[in-house]
Amino acid sequence: MTSNQHKQSALCGAWPSPISAAMVAAGAAPLSQVVLDGADAYWLAGRASESGRNTLLRQRGQDVREMTPAPFNVRTRVHEYGGGALLVADGTVIFSNFADNRLYMAADGADPVALGTGAGSDTATTARYADFVLDHQRQRLIAVREEHAGAGHPVNTVCAVGVDGSETVLVEGGDFYAAPRISPDGRQLAWLSWNHPNMPWQGTELWLAEVDAAGALSGAHLVAGGIDEAVCQPEWSPGGVLHFVSDRGGWWNLYRFDGAALKALCPRDAEFGVPHWAFGGSMYGFRSEQEIICTYIENGVSRLAQLSVASGTLAPIANPYQEIRDLRVAGSVIALLGGAPTIALELARIDLSTGELAVLARSITNLPNAAELSVPESTSYPTSGGRHAHAFYYPPCNAGYEAAPGAKPPLMVISHGGPTGMASNTLKLATQYWTSRGFAVLDVNYGGSSGFGRAYRDALKGQWGVIDVDDCVAGARHLSERGMVDAERLVIRGGSAGGLTTLCALTFHDGFKAGASYYGVSDLKGLDDDSHKFESHYNEYLIAPKAQAASLYQQRSPIH
């Protein structure tokens, strides 16, 4: 007897479900900013019960300890989206506190103490800090600094911060900076910069300078990048060779710079990088001078592998995840945030020498039975302009119910935010809420999404509100024409940039019967007028310079 013979037939969309609205509303506990310090693992845990406060946890052996008790909130708002709010070295933690923007130090076992003891040291600062690295030789931090004291947009620099709170500007003049990285011998500093109107996934520059004994920079020169090349994730190997990720070949691939020439380590139609929305992300690290542990995205799914620098070959590393973030490497141990269709995002440690995997923290601890979970299928389908779009298709799934013979499920289309972002197939209760009730769900990676190469990402250039909408509409039509869903019961939802896609699909197209826009964009001119510095020229890429295309902004705004 098959399992289907135990199921009852019922109207798709109205099946009783074990996943309640309360479970969805409770959400997942945020996990972020993983750090390995020797054998110790650190991570940020978001606490909804404490107004969303981010606290730093450390696991040492079997003991988990909170390193930043209330009211400390480990967070920064550099570029508004933050990230990169902490540094750990030899048991000492340095972090940015959200309430006052100040940097604090917590020695192993001690309470956090603010850096600097001078006049006014007990007050909040107008400067924000992110992406710290430790300059061991000079006992100082090097960080991205964003000063909000003046009128207009803030001023961004790379600065050195002493333990006494003193500051020295090292690099200035650019609109934005990220990823200052000092070489193991302390003699060179690399960093990223970019200027308006570019976003960091459009064009960035990787710079390198000498650092003298006193800590001053000289001989700064461009290593890679430009207005049409996006460079990210510069890191030094243990032996002092600069590595980075660039999309100069059409995909974000790994490169190394030996001081004279650039070399692509593993040319591949895969993404070893993601858009720089926030600081502190990592997709590779060094096991040794000749071995790089890396994660990359291929066909919308993350892989984990060991890359041989000498041969350029990738050796897969067994793991259960299809989305991997915040990869950290310390010798033969790695830590990462991982998720999969039946695994909500979790923090895991993998011992590369034994293959043993240990889960250190879970974002959701009370999951439904696996029989209630819809496992998505990767799919591609034709859309406007002779293109193909990508998506994850979730069929209806319920352990106790099935569609009546000949009945077709309603379809919910999801448009992700960004818009330069990506939908993953990691388990989300907000999706399973619908599939367990008899809905099909199509989570669309429309043209402009990351994870599919530069050309796919650039498909949205000048086309926001058009290409993304076309791809959602085409996805629903594709499934309807194949008889997989009920063409008379199509709905769409999305948040932020995905909210604009949703509103445009409802306003300018037929087909969807209903939709939900969560904190969505409806007025593109209003968005442009109110954007913060980081995104203040984003619409020039997504639509056009406003002064040249005021009518276009109005045409694509659902509010009009």
Report each predicted region and the residues it spans.
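Non-catalytic accessory segments flanking enzyme active sites
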Residues: A28-V35, Y42-A45, E66, A130, ...
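A short beta-strand motif characteristic of beta-propeller blades
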Residues: I19-A25, R65-T76, P112-D122, E167-V171, ...
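Conserved beta-propeller blade repeats
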Residues: G27-D37, N73-V93, G120-L141, G174-L189, ...
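Cap/lid segment of the alpha/beta-hydrolase catalytic domain
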Residues: A149, P197, S363-E488, G495, ...
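A flexible loop/linker signature enriched in serine peptidases of the S9 family
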Residues: A45-T55, V74-E80, F95-L103, A119-R128, ...
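Beta-strand-rich domains and repeat architectures in extracellular enzymes and scaffolds
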Residues: C12-Q59, R75-L87
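Short loop/turn segments that connect beta-strands within beta-propeller blades
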Residues: R60-Q62, A107-A110, G162-G165, V211-G215, ...
